[in-house]
UniProtKB/Swiss-Prot annotation:
GO cellular component terms listed in the entry, alphabetical order: plasma membrane-derived thylakoid membrane; proton-transporting ATP synthase complex
Organism: Prochlorococcus marinus (strain NATL1A)
UniProt subunit comment: F-type ATPases have 2 components, CF(1) - the catalytic core - and CF(0) - the membrane proton channel. CF(1) has five subunits: alpha(3), beta(3), gamma(1), delta(1), epsilon(1). CF(0) has three main subunits: a, b and c.
Lineage: Bacteria, Bacillati, Cyanobacteriota, Cyanophyceae, Synechococcales
HAMAP family assigned to the protein according to its UniProt record, in alphabetical order: ATP_synth_gamma_bact
Gene transcribed to yield this protein: atpG
Protein name: ATP synthase gamma chain
Xref: CDD domains: F1-ATPase_gamma
Function comment: Produces ATP from ADP in the presence of a proton gradient across the membrane. The gamma chain is believed to be important in regulating ATPase activity and the flow of protons through the CF(0) complex.
Length: 316
């Protein structure tokens, strides 16, 4: 059996590790709320922009619109935007996106297309750059804000827009993690370009808040509040032509779509980290409990051995 001092030192080490993982869990839980608030704050702009596009759509056929962002040309090159994080300790969050990107890349190559990658996050960059002979990397972005901002989305949007408009790529897809709940995050593929603003709809969001129960911090979920805005008047008059409006609004719509993907990915990363740290804390607690039992058994065995030696010496 292990030395008593070794077991005691390991118990102390495990308990200290549990303090760290518990602190990381609480920090991630608080940041999930911050990321969620960012999504809710950006929603009014997204809703109004969608309504304006819907109004324009009702007055013209998008298929007939003279906008390069809507043109569906023959597809030869497809750009994949892979969104991961800059840090680990978040379960399978980064690995799932990387696997999904590899699978999609192989699918497109097998179908005769020429895929390339735009990598967002250090984890994706590090993985695919180490395999640069197998993958064509177009651009990389790292060290974005923990809660993505419109500036982050704008820099990436400028890159993909330039490539699409110059016909260096014919389609752009984003692979990100859709935030479903604190325990469910799904890798998702969404086509960014060419744009198709039809069927715009916001799925129901959930909001999460820290509270206490039985002296323990817990997280409650609730439905996000929705504010019904009045629809734009049907007789509203636009000074510019529909084509001019589309050319001005569609880049904003694209940027908003990408921002939403970045925000959902950030929330998913934080939720995954919170879950991973919660599991680590539980495992550390169980390990400390088992080590304490081993320590007590070893201590009892040592005391029994000493008693036997004393009794044996007295008998002699």
């Amino acid at each position: 059996m292990a030395n008593l001092k070794d077991i005691r030192d390991r118990i102390v080490s495990v308990k200290n590790t549990r303090k760290i993982t518990e602190a990381m869990r609480l920090v991630a839980a608080a940041k999930v709320r911050r990321a969620q608030d960012q999504v809710l704050r950006s929603r009014p702009f997204a809703d109004r922009l969608a309504r304006v596009l819907e109004n324009i759509q009702s007055r013209m056929q998008f298929e007939a619109a003279d906008s390069p962002l809507l043109n569906k040309r023959e597809v030869k090159t497809i750009t994949l935007l892979a969104v991961t994080g800059d840090r680990g300790l978040c379960g399978g969050y980064n690995a799932n996106i990387i696997k999904r990107t590899e699978k999609r890349y192989a699918e497109l190559k097998g179908q005769g297309y020429s895929p390339d990658l735009v990598l967002i996050g250090k984890k994706a960059i590090g993985y695919f750059e180490n395999r640069s002979s197998l993958y064509n990397i177009r651009a990389t972005f790292k060290e974005l804000e923990q809660v993505p901002t419109s500036e982050d989305a704008a820099s990436i949007t400028s890159e993909v827009l330039a490539e699409f408009l110059s016909e260096s790529t014919d389609r752009v897809e984003v692979i990100f993690t859709k935030f479903v709940s604190l325990v469910s995050c799904n890798p998702t593929i969404q086509t960014l370009l060419p744009l198709d603003p039809q069927g715009i709809a916001d799925s129901e969001d959930e909001i999460f808040r820290l509270t206490t129960k039985d002296s323990q911090l817990i997280i409650e979920k609730d439905a996000a509040p929705t504010n019904e805005e009045p629809k734009l008047p049907s007789d509203i008059v636009f000074e510019q032509s529909p084509d001019q409006l589309l050319n001005a609004l569609l880049p904003l719509y694209l940027q908003n779509q990408l921002l939403r993907a970045l925000q959902e990915s950030a929330a998913s990363e934080l939720a995954s980290r919170m879950t991973a740290m919660n599991n680590a804390s539980d495992n550390a607690k169980e390990l400390a409990k088992n080590l304490t039992i081993d320590y007590n058994k070893a201590r009892q065995a040592a005391i029994t051995q000493e008693i036997l030696e004393v009794v044996g010496g007295a008998s002699a």
